[in-house]
Structure formats: C-alpha cells, structure tokens
C-alpha cells in the first residue's frame, strides 16, 4: 500500500467513525490539516483532523472521549488519525498557532 492509499484509507475510516457516532448530528465541519493537507506527508505521517461541533455537543463528553479513542483503525498498515475537537466556528477568529495553521493549510472534507 502506498502512502496515498494509506492516508486515504485512514481518512475514510475516521469519517465513518464520526458519522456512526452520536455526535454526528452536531458536526459543523471536518477539516484535514497538517502534512497530508499540504502534500508533504511521508509514509509514516499521521492524519490530522479538526472536528468542529455545535455547542450542544459539550454535554456529550463520554461520546467525545470515545470518538477520540476510536478514530484510528486497529490495522497496523493504516495511518493513525489525530483528532482535534472544537466547538462552534469561533476557532476561525482564534490566534492560537494551531488554528492559524489550520486556517492557512486546512481542507474542509465534510
């Protein structure tokens, strides 16, 4: 499996886990960022995802923790996924370094 297939498979898996989650009704957007979004990934790179949820999802802490823990496939050949979660779309106004990078390089995938 080449790096493109590896990362595509990991993204598809993560998106399926998000859609299966009780949080799916609160999803505002999913943004791919990091080396994969910049086309600078290596074979061993992980995928970085920002999950933007509606404020109401804050009440679903257990589901949030469960999703974070299950966002990557158990298959050793698959890339790992790193999931960042934020609420509402105020992240776009943030001056935090991570959000500045996401605004610059991020690709909305859902």
Protein language model regions, located:
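Catalytic core of pol beta-like nucleotidyltransferases
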Residues: 1-29, 37-43, 54-110
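Short, conserved active-site loops that position catalytic residues or coordinate cofactors/metal ions
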Residues: 45-47
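Short beta-strand->loop micro-motif that forms the acidic, two-metal-ion catalytic signature
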Residues: 49-51
């Amino acid at each position: 499996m080449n790096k493109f297939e590896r990362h595509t498979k990991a993204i598809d898996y993560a998106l399926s886990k998000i859609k299966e989650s009780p949080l799916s009704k609160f999803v505002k957007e999913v943004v791919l960022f990091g080396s994969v979004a910049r086309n600078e990934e290596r074979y061993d790179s992980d995928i970085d995802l920002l999950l933007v949820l509606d404020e109401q999802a804050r009440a679903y802490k257990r589901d949030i923790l469960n999703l974070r823990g299950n966002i990557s496939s158990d298959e050793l050949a698959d890339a790992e996924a790193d999931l960042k979660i934020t609420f509402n779309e105020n992240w776009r106004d943030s001056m935090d370094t991570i959000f500045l990078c996401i605004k610059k390089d991020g690709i909305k995938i859902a």
